[in-house]
Amino acid sequence: MLVNALQEKLGYIFNRYDLLLQALTHRSSSNQHNERLEFLGDAILNYVIANLLYHRFPHISEGGMSRMRANLVRENTLATLAREFNLGDYLQLGQGELKSGGYQRESILANTIEALIGGIFLDSNIQTIEILIINWYKIRIDHMDPYASYDTQKDPKTRLQEYMQRRRLPLPVYWINQIIGEAHNQIFTINCQVSELTQPIIGCGSSRRRAEQNAAAKVLEALEHNQNI
């Protein structure tokens, strides 16, 4: 089944397929849509991130933790996470949303991530979804500077995309250059091309997501030689 690939990317196999289907269903497609799951998932996500930040950064003030949490749970971050799972390929949308490109809309992608969190919680328990969320956010947490400004706390891919958008330039293009190793022990090499650089920049990582983030970080470093971003 097509959704099996999604479950592998999420790192969780649903016991109740109906919860997975509901989490992926937009209100434009069915009355059995995902908005109640989204409500639940939003609360769970905020709890998990708040708890994680509290224990990970014991010397950071309440205001600092609030800024970090806001960055991690905001719509753009969730939509970026959804794209890393190729979530748009699995959405159940009505014809109107399909024609208008709803599978790419950040609000729909972000809401679906929250609905999946709610669905996984109902399908399992708080401990399971907490472990999953921490795993999904590991790269972002590891690269987060608690003393940095709100803008610089964004992950490299998000910062690069916003850099290009501010200048009305084409968005970065990522493609796989090479995959080495057996399944579950692979090294991905990703090329990232932007219009302001003549050659693509290469990033490596143990997953496509990590390799893309590393490539984006290197592109940002290259662009910083020309202007302050």
From Swiss-Prot:
The molecule here is called Ribonuclease 3
Return the broad EC class.
Answer: hydrolase
Which is one Gene Ontology cellular component term of this protein? cytoplasm
Active site residues according to the UniProt entry = 42, 114
Q: For the RNase III domain, which residue ranges apply?
A: 3-125
Identify which cofactors the protein needs according to its UniProt entry: Mg(2+)
HAMAP family xref list: RNase_III
Q: E.C. number, please?
A: 3.1.26.3
What are the subcellular locations of this protein?
Cytoplasm
NCBIfam families referenced in this protein's UniProt entry, alphabetically:
RNaseIII
Q: Which keywords belong to this entry?
A: Cytoplasm, Endonuclease, Hydrolase, Magnesium, Metal-binding, mRNA processing, Nuclease, RNA-binding, rRNA processing, rRNA-binding, tRNA processing
The record's similarity note reads:
Belongs to the ribonuclease III family.
- UniProt function note: Digests double-stranded RNA. Involved in the processing of primary rRNA transcript to yield the immediate precursors to the large and small rRNAs (23S and 16S). Processes some mRNAs, and tRNAs when they are encoded in the rRNA operon. Processes pre-crRNA and tracrRNA of type II CRISPR loci if present in the organism.
**Which cysteines does the record link by disulfide bonds?**
none
For the ligand (Mg(2+)), the binding residues are 38, 111, 114
Tell me what organism the protein belongs to: Blochmanniella pennsylvanica (strain BPEN)
Q: Spell out the subunit comment.
A: Homodimer.
One Pfam family from the record: dsrm
The molecular function terms of the Gene Ontology recorded here are: double-stranded RNA binding; metal ion binding; ribonuclease III activity; rRNA binding
Q: Name one GO biological process term.
A: regulation of gene expression
Main location (coarse class): cytoplasm
Q: Does the keyword S-adenosyl-L-methionine apply?
A: no
Residues annotated as domain DRBM: 155-225
